């Protein structure tokens, strides 16, 4: 009985992940390009990386090098075959919204140039996005892999592990 319950819970979590759509929102990349989610993501796989606090940002940074090497710099032997939208999304909520312009400008000054197109600042209140995506803990980063139709096919949270990264890699055709 316990095993069948575990199987049911596992299958339910997979289906909810696959069935979920990303809510509509707009943003601007750190290199000033306007992006409309999910419309501008269709046609390619997309990895969206959300962080809504300093602590979450620290864990998100553990993902930067592997994601950068595989999908942005494409340094591996077979990495050229990957054509994936990558967006690191600092989620601003509450009083941080009033500092959005200064946060964005400071970020641009301190970020290497080839990462600027991959940093997306939301135009909407980040709290709504977090709520819609059921991202309840502000102290951990969240990662969503979207298929070519911009549907969520995988989600994870927390610091980088090879298992999480391999799961993402395996889902990208």
Model-derived segments and their meaning:
Residues 138-173:
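Thiol-/selenol-based redox modules, centered on thioredoxin-like
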Residues 4-14:
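Sec-dependent N-terminal signal peptides
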Residues 98-139:
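Thioredoxin-like thiol-disulfide oxidoreductase module
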Residues 17-38, 62:
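N-terminal "domain-start" segment that seeds a small globular fold
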Residues 40-64:
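Short active-site neighborhood of thiol/selenol oxidoreductases, capturing the structured segment around
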Residues 56-112:
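Structural microenvironment flanking redox-active thiols in thiol-disulfide oxidoreductases
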């Amino acid at each position: 009985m316990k095993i069948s319950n575990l199987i049911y819970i596992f299958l339910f979590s997979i289906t909810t992940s696959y069935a979920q759509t990303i809510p509509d929102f707009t943003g601007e990349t750190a290199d000033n390009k306007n992006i409309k989610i999910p419309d501008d993501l269709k046609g390619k796989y997309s990895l969206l990386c959300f962080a809504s606090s300093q602590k979450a940002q620290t864990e998100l940074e553990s993902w930067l090098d592997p994601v950068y090497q595989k999908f942005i710099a494409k340094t591996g032997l077979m990495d050229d075959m990957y054509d994936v939208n990558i967006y690191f999304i600092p989620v601003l909520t509450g009083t941080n919204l009033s500092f959005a312009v200064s946060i964005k400008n400071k970020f641009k000054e301190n970020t290497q140039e080839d990462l600027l197109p991959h940093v997306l600042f939301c135009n909407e209140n980040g709290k709504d996005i977090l709520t819609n995506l059921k991202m309840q803990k502000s102290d951990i980063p969240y990662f969503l892999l979207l298929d070519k139709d911009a549907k969520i096919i995988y989600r994870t949270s927390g610091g980088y592990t090879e298992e999480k990264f391999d799961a993402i890699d395996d889902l990208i055709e």
